């Protein structure tokens, strides 16, 4: 379909990372908040969004989640707690913190989950977000889908630490690393993080080490 020219723009597939979205979203209620990424199709499916509307949106059709105007990278489905995916690297952290703050102020027992990639951890928005979440003990779970490459750059090119979860320590935040290819590991780690958040014990950074079976996007030469 993509190569037939039926999908406008870029297409970032989630093939290989399904255990992360599934393991995380199995712990969430319908009204819990999720902020997604440019590679968000799996998050939307796992959170309960209509797969036909997702497909329609990817193809730019009026019957899509955003009436075909958002496309593959910019979808939203508030009825299912999905407050947007974004093509901006690190762009999901600020709204995820805002949603977590709203949940705390409203005593709603909701949690806010922010999916992100390994490359986005170097963005200033990550550090600002996790710092505020720690100071205010917000019900925020940052799920870092570490597929070992920030587009074409391997992790050792842009981060000294072996486990990204270690970076949470500098903010007094609990960090944990799990095998992102194992749905049971992801589920267990996320359950603990969600339970802590609902008890008012603050944020958690969950790093899921996974691997992307395709290139960064459809048509990627994968020269790296």
Predicted feature residues:
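Flexible, glycine/charged-enriched surface loops at secondary-structure junctions
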Residues: 1, 112, 201-205
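Short acidic (Asp/Glu) and glycine-rich catalytic loops that position anionic groups and cofactors
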Residues: 2, 31-36, 145-146, 167-174, ...
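Structured core elements
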Residues: 12, 35, 141-143, 177, ...
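Short gly/pro/ser/thr-enriched loop/turn and capping motifs at secondary-structure boundaries
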Residues: 42, 148-151, 212-214
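Short, well-ordered secondary-structure micro-motifs
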Residues: 47, 125, 152-155, 187-189, ...
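Ligand/cofactor pocket segment of small-molecule handling proteins
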Residues: 135-138, 145-203
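Glycine/aspartate-rich loop-and-adjacent alpha/beta segment that forms the canonical ThDP
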Residues: 196-224
């Amino acid at each position: 379909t993509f190569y037939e020219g039926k999908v406008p723009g870029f297409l970032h597939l989630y093939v290989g990372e399904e255990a992360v979205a599934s393991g995380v979203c199995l712990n969430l209620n319908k009204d819990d908040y999720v902020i997604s990424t440019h590679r968000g199709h799996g998050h939307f499916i796992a959170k309960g969004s209509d797969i036909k509307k997702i497909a329609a949106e990817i193809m730019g059709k009026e019957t899509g989640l955003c009436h075909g105007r958002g496309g593959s990278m910019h979808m939203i489905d508030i009825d299912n707690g999905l407050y947007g995916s974004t093509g901006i690297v690190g762009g999901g952290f600020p709204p995820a913190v805002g949603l977590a703050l709203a949940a705390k102020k409203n005593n709603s027992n909701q949690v806010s989950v922010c999916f992100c990639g390994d490359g986005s951890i170097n963005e200033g928005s990550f550090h600002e977000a996790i710092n505020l979440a720690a100071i205010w003990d917000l019900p925020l779970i940052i799920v870092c889908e570490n597929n070992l490459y920030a587009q074409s750059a391997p992790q050792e090119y842009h981060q000294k630490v072996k486990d990204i979860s270690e970076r949470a320590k500098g903010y007094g935040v609990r960090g944990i690393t799990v095998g992102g290819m194992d749905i049971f590991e992801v589920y267990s780690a996320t359950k603990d993080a969600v339970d802590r958040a609902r008890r008012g014990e603050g944020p958690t950074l969950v790093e899921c080490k996974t691997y992307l079976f395709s290139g960064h996007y459809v048509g990627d030469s994968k020269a790296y």
